[in-house]
């Protein structure tokens, strides 16, 4: 009996083993994705069935039946991110960027995703405190939470993320001070020795910038603290970070003198100190020979002449010194740096004559000297194209027709890589560079600190367009072409904004799979622009013209495979059942033979047939007495402990 039960249990085990092979998704992972789907009012359209890996759910990547990546950029997903995400124990990438319908706080147990490397939630609508448990994601490399509505403070536990490369929380409502370690049990941002990017701009961070935040062991290249409420002085320890290339401290409430120790940052290319409350005089920064951009506008420096050392900064392209009480005349060599493109000196007390001389940069495009005391302007030769603004200077206060330099002319932002001769498209479509009408991905590239400022030279933008196009083609993305247009500078933070259009390949609109791929290239910073454009963020517009689910063919193939596997399973089960029944029949026959007392009677060697037992027969006492002749001793065959027989 026990052997029959064992065989039956083996059959059940084999059945479930076969079923588990036929489903290509780990059971726990499948349940977790189903729970996520239940939280979303608009999940991807092909998220159907119970086998996300086997039926190729859009945005889901699997390895060995485990979900390792979720990438759903700009797929109009709406709802909340539930704690069920923590069940995906093999997850390495989570990218939900550009889904503005994703709201609510992050789940507190998100730190259970021990293998997570990329957490990318750019441009959603998440709120609340960043969970402390994020500090448990020991494998994390990219942490991009920018362009949301997060509040609260920066978790000190993030200091434990020893592999973190990219840390971006810009454009939120995060407040409080910057956490630093206490040398014993409490972690802090000073422990992030491998991190290259601190992007904290446009928040509500306050207090002083801690002295022990920076050290010579750090490898930071970008420190972007602009648009916060920091107070106090620039810490001298900042100059210990020799790898720094971009420093943005503008639009805070910093005070004191600008430290001369900044001269130690010899790799620095961008220095933004504008719109603070710095005092004293501007220090000599001649050691910053790699500097492209210097912006010290709108501080409370003491009155001083224009620094002569400016002309020694050979790499300087953009100089902004608005409203810092500069006086006297402009030095003859002031415009001589070979890369100089833009000079902003408005709202000062500069007087005398504006004369570019003969040694000015041939890259020079724009000079703004509004609200000064210039009374003479010696214009350069007629073949020189420099836009000069001298409005509200004595030279422009004479009666009569005023020259162009006495008016503020807005910069030309009409540049576009889409030919103006294209026939206008209908139904909300856009013309591609080849004049083909389609529904492109449209968004804006925000370049946070470009190393150039001139908008008149189209070469930089042609290089950018080709760079993006080549990137997509090299990786065989479903992209036909890209276009850029509406180039402008943000007047507040001087970021460079460019509208980007990415056109689908071989169809009128993207499917969901193609959309996910394109957006991940930007959200994950897989695409890297030419060096002169610096750090960037892409913000995609909502997309509502999907051509199909993007995974229907895969789903159909999954159904076909499932049906085929089911048929094989059924056939195998029937075969196993037949084998089992045959073996049971043979066992029954062997048992019958063993219980037959005449089973080995050899009739070939005897003329007498084997006795045929008809069953047990009962005899009465009288019959026994008669047959034994009243129990005569002549019929005695033997004796035993219980009497004679």
Located regions from the model:
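Plant-biased, solvent-exposed loop and capping regions
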Residues: 1-583, 589-595, 609
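Cytoplasmic C-terminal tails of single-pass
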Residues: 588-616
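Protein kinase glycine-rich loop
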Residues: 634-645
